[in-house]
Amino acid sequence: MNDTLAITYSTPARLSEAEKLARQMKLPLVSLNSTDYSFLLVFTPAHLELRSTGTKAPGPLYVDFLKGATAHRRLFGGGRSQLIVRAVGLKSHPHPTILDLTAGLGRDAFVLANFGCDVLMIERNPVIALLLRDGLERAQSVEWFKSLKLELIEIDAQIYLSTLKKQFDVIYMDPMYPIRKKSALVKKEMRILRRLVGADDDAPQLLALALKKAKHRVVIKRPLLSNPLPGPAPDVVYEGKSSRFDVYLLKPSS
């Protein structure tokens, strides 16, 4: 990571935060216009963002639960008819505990939390976890967000699952997969995330562990035309325009 990422700031008011993070992550603190690194973590007046450098670099990446695409999805995303809401089984279990093994930018977890789910997000990549935590902390400024049950832990999902003692009603996973034809926004995010994080090559191992740890079901988000993950066949599949949700139903313990 030291060869690809550096820390910077766009306002002197956030210099001390940038210096602190650079020390914590053992990364260089550079000028805002530096092009010596593939990515810059930038402290702006509004938020923490990830920028790609270069002449054809996509726009910055940051987490905002209060406005933009994420907030729009909360208000106009289709309510309980959304595939992800149906896939996690809210009809039969209205307020489930959900373990999201691949939190990413937190969008799916945010949707589920808005429907009364108690969601624990797991993110293994420290940079993505920083962006997500920054978005969570800024959203605490509004009362309705404070009431959501949404928590983040930065840890490798395999390590967390292998030592997990409690049972979650649902374990959810959206592993990184090859870029397909999507909207400009998703293309930008996928390009940045894939360069930074890479593919989730351990998705089959995570599925095998999740099937042993979940109480009611395991839900895997997949590209519409892709094969299911290696292992047992899903019991139910919810198909959308470009993606689908493979659902593995678990029998109650005797």
Curated annotation (Swiss-Prot):
Q: Which GO terms describe its molecular function?
A: rRNA (guanine-N2-)-methyltransferase activity
Q: Give the top-rank taxon of the lineage listed in the UniProt record for this protein.
A: Bacteria
Q: What class of enzyme is it?
A: transferase
Pfam families given in the database record: SAM_MT
Indicate where this protein resides in the cell: Cytoplasm
Q: Which reaction does it catalyse?
A: guanosine(1516) in 16S rRNA + S-adenosyl-L-methionine = N(2)-methylguanosine(1516) in 16S rRNA + S-adenosyl-L-homocysteine + H(+)
**GO cellular component term, pick one:** cytoplasm
Enzyme Commission no? 2.1.1.242
- Return the SUPFAM superfamilies for the record: S-adenosyl-L-methionine-dependent methyltransferases
Stored Gene3D superfamilies: Vaccinia Virus protein VP39 (3.40.50.150)
Q: Which residues bind S-adenosyl-L-methionine?
A: R107, D108, E123, R124, D174
| Keywords on record | Cytoplasm, Methyltransferase, rRNA processing, S-adenosyl-L-methionine, Transferase
Identify the HAMAP family for this entry: 16SrRNA_methyltr_J
The record's family statement is: Belongs to the methyltransferase superfamily. RsmJ family.
* Function of the protein: Specifically methylates the guanosine in position 1516 of 16S rRNA.
Please identify the protein, giving its name as recorded: Ribosomal RNA small subunit methyltransferase J
Species, as recorded: Coxiella burnetii (strain Dugway 5J108-111)
Q: What is the lineage of its organism?
A: Bacteria, Pseudomonadati, Pseudomonadota, Gammaproteobacteria, Legionellales
